[in-house]
């Protein structure tokens, strides 16, 4: 018995229609279905669910590093930054990174959920940690 993959990512949103537009227009999501309070999109090969929940306090989101990260090609990195700026997306200050840890852009959606666009892979991250984070214990080879 095993878990085979991430099934979907669900975001609680305050306004379904504006969130659909954000995920379609900004992240190039493909809208699959929408209803009164729920919509499904795909971004890359990832199923994104949006559930409208208007009366949920959203201020706790800004205090957490919790986020979802999507992969982008490194050659498109500057283009993505420009795209997000042109569309007035709330770009966050990223954490300091070693170049071996690849590149990331952090920003928020309309409800403050943190999203990352990252140029590295899991293998890249593990190789970086093996070289730079000698205090870490590794369990599998990549």
Swiss-Prot record:
GO terms for cellular component: cytoplasm. CDD domains: FosB. Its cofactor is Mg(2+). It holds the Pfam family Glyoxalase. Keywords: Antibiotic resistance, Cytoplasm, Magnesium, Metal-binding, Transferase. PROSITE patterns: VOC (PS51819). The active site is at 116 (proton donor/acceptor). Residues 5-120 form the VOC domain. One of its GO terms (biological process) is response to antibiotic. GO terms for molecular function: magnesium ion binding; transferase activity, transferring alkyl or aryl (other than methyl) groups. Belongs to the fosfomycin resistance protein family. FosB subfamily. Metallothiol transferase which confers resistance to fosfomycin by catalyzing the addition of a thiol cofactor to fosfomycin. L-cysteine is probably the physiological thiol donor. Homodimer. This is Metallothiol transferase FosB.
């Amino acid at each position: 018995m095993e878990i085979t993959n991430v099934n979907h990512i669900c975001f609680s949103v305050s306004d379904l229609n504006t969130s659909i537009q954000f995920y379609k227009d900004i992240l190039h999501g493909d809208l699959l279905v929408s209803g009164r309070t729920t919509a499904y999109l795909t971004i890359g090969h990832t199923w994104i669910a949006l559930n409208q929940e208007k009366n949920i306090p959203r201020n706790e989101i800004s205090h957490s590093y919790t986020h979802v990260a999507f992969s982008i090609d490194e050659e498109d990195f500057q283009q993505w930054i420009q795209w997000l700026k042109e569309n007035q997306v709330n770009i966050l200050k990223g954490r300091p990174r070693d170049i071996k840890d690849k590149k990331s852009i952090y920003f928020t959606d309309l409800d403050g959920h943190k999203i990352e666009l990252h140029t590295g892979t899991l293998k890249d991250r593990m190789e970086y940690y093996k070289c730079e984070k000698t205090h870490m214990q590794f369990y599998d080879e990549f």
